[in-house]
């Protein structure tokens, strides 16, 4: 049903959401493991979210608050916290209402996302994505490094931006 390209935070969450809605999901990551950029967030501790209402948070948004407002309404900070706690990652709130895993390990957040995706029968494939296959006006699939091509009814491109090239980010799909 759904092919997701990129196994960072957005790709993993998209895989989980699609699988929870009954779709079969294949998640492809060009690197050898998922969440490499996520591992360095919050100085390796992963600032998961902020523990405040949308109304408290919005005055701190400097650019494009309308876009962010709709995103936060779709999955607010308290729902994010509940999700990770249901996945077995206890959280704590620190100065500035920043939320971190109690362990102070971003790897625990990545592992929780991977475990949840696998629990929902998502197929995760690492180190193989090569290029997007673009048909008429849409992405139809991806070619793999071994020459194989995967197609899907729905394709989500979650390849991230160009920041932190040391993590493997090249801006593919940006």
Q: Locations of the language-model features?
A:
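Hydrophobic/aromatic ligand-binding patch that stacks against planar heteroaromatic rings
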Residues: 13, 17, 30, 38, ...
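N-terminal Rossmann-like FAD-binding beta1-loop-alpha1 element of flavoenzymes
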Residues: 1-27
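Conserved N-terminal/central alpha/beta ligand/cofactor-binding core
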Residues: 30-123, 128
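Predominantly flavin-linked oxidoreductase catalytic cores and closely associated redox partners
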Residues: 40, 107-174
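Structural motif
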Residues: 2-3, 24-26, 37-38, 45-46, ...
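Cofactor-binding loop segments of dinucleotide-utilizing enzymes, especially the Rossmann-like FAD-
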Residues: 7, 30, 160
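Gly/Ser/Thr-rich beta-alpha loop segments that engage phosphate groups in nucleotides
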Residues: 8-13, 37, 43-46, 162-163
């Amino acid at each position: 049903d759904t092919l997701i390209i990129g196994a960072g935070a957005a790709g993993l969450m998209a895989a989980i959401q699609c699988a929870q809605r009954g779709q079969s999901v294949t998640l492809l990551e060009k690197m050898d493991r998922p969440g490499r950029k996520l591992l360095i967030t919050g100085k390796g501790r992963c600032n998961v979210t902020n523990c405040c209402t949308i109304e408290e948070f919005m005055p701190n948004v400097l650019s494009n608050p309308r876009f962010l407002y709709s995103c936060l309404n779709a999955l607010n900070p308290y729902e994010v916290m509940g999700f990770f706690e249901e996945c077995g990652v206890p959280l704590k709130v620190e100065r500035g209402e920043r939320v971190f895993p109690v362990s102070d390990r971003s790897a625990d957040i990545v592992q929780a996302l991977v475990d949840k995706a696998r629990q929902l029968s998502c197929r995760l494939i690492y180190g193989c994505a090569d290029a997007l296959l673009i048909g008429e006006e849409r992405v139809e699939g991806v070619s793999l490094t071994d020459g194989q091509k995967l197609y899907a009814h729905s394709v989500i491109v979650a390849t991230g931006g160009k920041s932190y090239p040391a993590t493997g980010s090249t801006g593919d799909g940006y």
